[in-house]
């Protein structure tokens, strides 16, 4: 039996599920994903359009399959659908032991709906159901963005008995709406006769992008007080989100009534945890966000940083809400418009994924054209 890295094992023991924010066929074929499971405590995988775009643009791993699809006359969308769902299905199969050992809580792989549908409720619902059927694995998560149009889609998809990873959450206010959408979906699933214990969900709360946007604005203000607040907003925001999570899933009658029928909590998932500012510790968004019943999905670079020098000191979130609120009060007092910050981040988040999707379309089209020659 291969030994787990002690730092990552300590993180897991503190209640944080370690997920890898990356997937490629090379990673699957080389056994690297299995190696990360065996040595770095990885118990889940998240993907997004940027990750697939990167996977397809590097090397020739997908050439043979794309040539075969081209010969069958597959168009670009069908090709992307086949290639990405094949990888996700394979990753689901690799993670079955973790799924079984955790009673379905971990061992999860996430695939995102087409980001061009971020503002279209009905089409999002339709595609989520299609992806669920195509991958056909019980340990799949369908990723749906927490846009205004995404919220009713989240409820509708959960009501079908499908597990959902809600993505692109930036503000605590929107996170509360996400938890409400989860509870609504579970209530509908109960009415439809689904087994609630089999429906799982996580809420992906983005961390580093909040610091990137707010730090930019603090630098523009330039006062000593402003500069002292740099690098604090991302962690403070996530800590306030965790306090909101506890309110709903530990104290609300609405969740209690679902729990009696087997409903699980919707766990907070810390996303965007790769540190973008070299002035900050490269494990900042891991060591400062340790709390029970959470997930931290990390790029491999961050997993390696935690493995090498991450100091895990137990729960660093519970009981921090008043200090976190103080950070936000100070940000407001010096003129940071937080409503605008979160609106910009959501719009930018959708746009980034759309841009990656368009690059993926172009690259796949080029692959198909080459194969057809």
From Swiss-Prot:
Gene Ontology biological process terms in this record: carbohydrate metabolic process; pentose-phosphate shunt
Enzyme class: transferase
Catalysis: reaction(s): D-sedoheptulose 7-phosphate + D-glyceraldehyde 3-phosphate = D-erythrose 4-phosphate + beta-D-fructose 6-phosphate
Protein name: Transaldolase
Entry's family note: Belongs to the transaldolase family. Type 2 subfamily.
EC number: 2.2.1.2
Subcellular location(s) per record: Cytoplasm
Chief place where the protein resides: cytoplasm
CC per GO annotation: cytoplasm
Pfam families: TAL_FSA (PF00923)
Function field: Transaldolase is important for the balance of metabolites in the pentose-phosphate pathway.
PROSITE patterns attached to this UniProt entry: TRANSALDOLASE_1, TRANSALDOLASE_2
Active site, per annotation: 143 (schiff-base intermediate with substrate)
Gene: tal
Keyword entries, A-Z: Cytoplasm, Pentose shunt, Schiff base, Transferase
Gene Ontology molecular-function annotations: transaldolase activity
CDD domains reported for this sequence: Transaldolase_like
Pathway assigned in UniProt: Carbohydrate degradation; pentose phosphate pathway; D-glyceraldehyde 3-phosphate and beta-D-fructose 6-phosphate from D-ribose 5-phosphate and D-xylulose 5-phosphate (non-oxidative stage): step 2/3
């Amino acid at each position: 039996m291969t030994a787990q890295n002690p730092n990552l094992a300590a993180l897991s023991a503190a209640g944080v599920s370690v997920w890898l924010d990356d997937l490629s066929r090379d990673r699957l074929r080389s056994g690297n994903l299995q190696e990360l499971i065996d040595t770095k405590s990885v118990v889940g995988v998240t993907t997004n359009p940027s990750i697939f775009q990167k996977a397809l643009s590097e090397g020739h791993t997908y050439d043979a399959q794309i040539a075969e699809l081209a010969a069958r006359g597959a168009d670009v969308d069908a090709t992307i659908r086949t290639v990405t769902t094949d990888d996700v299905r394979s990753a689901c199969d690799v993670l079955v032991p973790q799924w079984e050992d955790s009673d379905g809580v971990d061992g999860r792989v996430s695939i995102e709906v087409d980001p061009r549908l971020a503002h279209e409720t009905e089409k999002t619902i339709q595609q989520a159901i299609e992806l669920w059927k195509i991958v056909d694995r019980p340990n799949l998560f369908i990723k749906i963005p927490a846009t205004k149009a995404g919220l009713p889609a989240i409820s509708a998809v959960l009501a079908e008995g499908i597990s959902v990873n809600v993505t692109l959450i930036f503000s605590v206010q929107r996170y509360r709406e996400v938890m409400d959408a989860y509870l609504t979906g579970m209530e509908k699933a109960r009415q439809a006769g689904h087994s609630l214990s089999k429906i799982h969900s996580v809420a992906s709360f983005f961390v580093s992008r909040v610091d990137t946007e707010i730090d930019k604005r603090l630098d523009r203000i330039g006062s000593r007080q402003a500069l002292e607040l740099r690098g604090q907003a991302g962690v403070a925001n996530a800590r306030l989100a965790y306090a909101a999570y506890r309110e709903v899933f530990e104290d609300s009658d609405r969740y209690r009534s679902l729990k009696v029928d087997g409903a699980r909590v919707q766990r907070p998932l810390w996303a965007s945890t790769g540190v973008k500012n070299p002035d900050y510790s490269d494990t900042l968004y891991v060591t400062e966000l340790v709390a029970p019943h959470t997930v931290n999905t990390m790029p491999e670079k961050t997993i390696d940083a935690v493995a090498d020098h991450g100091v895990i000191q137990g729960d660093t979130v519970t009981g921090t809400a008043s200090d976190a609120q103080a950070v936000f009060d100070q940000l407001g007092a010096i003129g940071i418009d937080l409503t605008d910050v979160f609106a910009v981040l959501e719009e930018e988040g959708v746009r980034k994924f759309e841009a990656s999707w368009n690059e993926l379309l172009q690259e796949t089209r080029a692959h198909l054209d080459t194969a057809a020659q």
